């Protein structure tokens, strides 16, 4: 029984690329828990940021009830192509909503979704997915590694509205956006301007360094600006 003012957390099983494999390693995607439910006390309110807010009012998460006999399977990483487009669109949103936010910090926030260092995968037990497949629910569906989705359209709309240079420092250029533009045209969209990667050599190296090592690029000016900002934040808190 969940008492009034309590929040429920459950194990969060991150499936990876296939419906019957999940992460089991030292990454944030392994052996994690999330809050999935709460019992309202009629006083708690959501005071979350625009992005990445909690599923429960923050004030209730201190009253945690851990449930381990139920586990939540997370399908985010089954359709990796769509997942990569989603991460790009989120970073576009960040750049639009917080134009003064440090781009090195934005990139670092989203880099962990690409972290496959020393990746370990375990087989999901049949009982967790076969009964659903037998009921006609296609949780075993496989997805192509190429293609086009609605999030690509939204990114291209932002390019068309604001220009690509606005987004030159955020880590979204692991996707070939000119190829996406050509696919969009075939679907009837009118994106007329060719898209050329606007990044400098330093920015390209920075993005590669971040993706490979999950570390800030120590040679970038924005990194030192971020350090100063964090220091000042600590001093004045």
Language-model region placement:
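N-proximal low-complexity "stem/linker" segments adjacent to membrane-targeting elements
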Residues: 236-237
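Catalytic-site signature of metal-activated, phosphate-bearing donor transferases
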Residues: 1-232
